[in-house]
A protein has these predicted regions:
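Glycine-rich acetyl-CoA-binding "A-motif" of GNAT/NAT acetyltransferases
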Residues: 125
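Core segments of cupin and vicinal oxygen chelate
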Residues: 11-55
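N-terminal beta-strand motif that seeds the catalytic metal site of vicinal oxygen chelate
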Residues: 1-21, 76, 132-147
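Short glycine-enriched loop/turn motifs at secondary-structure junctions
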Residues: 4-6, 69-73, 110
Length: 147
């Protein structure tokens, strides 16, 4: 059976590529991503990438607004290692003018769940969260867990 070893890339369709690129230039730089540009069928694309995956912006074809409660993507959570790194990212976003929630613990999700939430220019909800103990245990022992 094939073994999925990670998420290779995510494509996000945006209403204004230049506006979204300015936003993601800040967010992804805070998180250590690099950037390149390319075209597919004459359409410009902007890709942010690190050693784990690529996050690609592409221009919209229709003008329907994003609705996180319609079928499709609700939000994207990017994981950093520690709660301290969540706080650092939130601080850096605030310094660069990106509005976000206060970084804090969310015990209703998990006892060590720490996160900051914000939205991109099209309303796509984004989260930066820590690598929680429950996740570490699941990742380390996934073959022994019940399917």
């Amino acid at each position: 059976m094939p073994d999925v070893i990670g998420i290779d890339h995510t494509y996000v369709t945006v209403s204004d590529l230049a506006r979204s690129e300015r936003f993601y230039d800040v967010v992804m730089a805070v998180l250590g991503f690099r950037k390149n540009r390319f075209q597919i069928d004459g359409e410009p694309h902007v890709q942010y990438y690190n050693r784990h995956f690529g996050y690609v912006l592409r221009p919209q074809h229709t003008s329907a607004p994003h609705d996180p409660y319609a079928p499709g993507l609700h939000h994207l959570a990017l994981r950093v290692n520690t709660a301290g790194e969540v706080k650092d990212a939130a601080h850096r976003l605030a310094e660069r003018g990106i509005p976000a929630s206060d970084p804090k613990q969310y015990p209703e999700y998990a006892s060590d769940y720490f996160a900051v939430f914000f939205s991109d220019p099209d309303g796509l909800r984004l989260e930066i969260t820590n690598y929680r103990q429950e996740r570490r245990e699941r990742h380390d022992n996934w073959k022994n867990l019940e399917p």
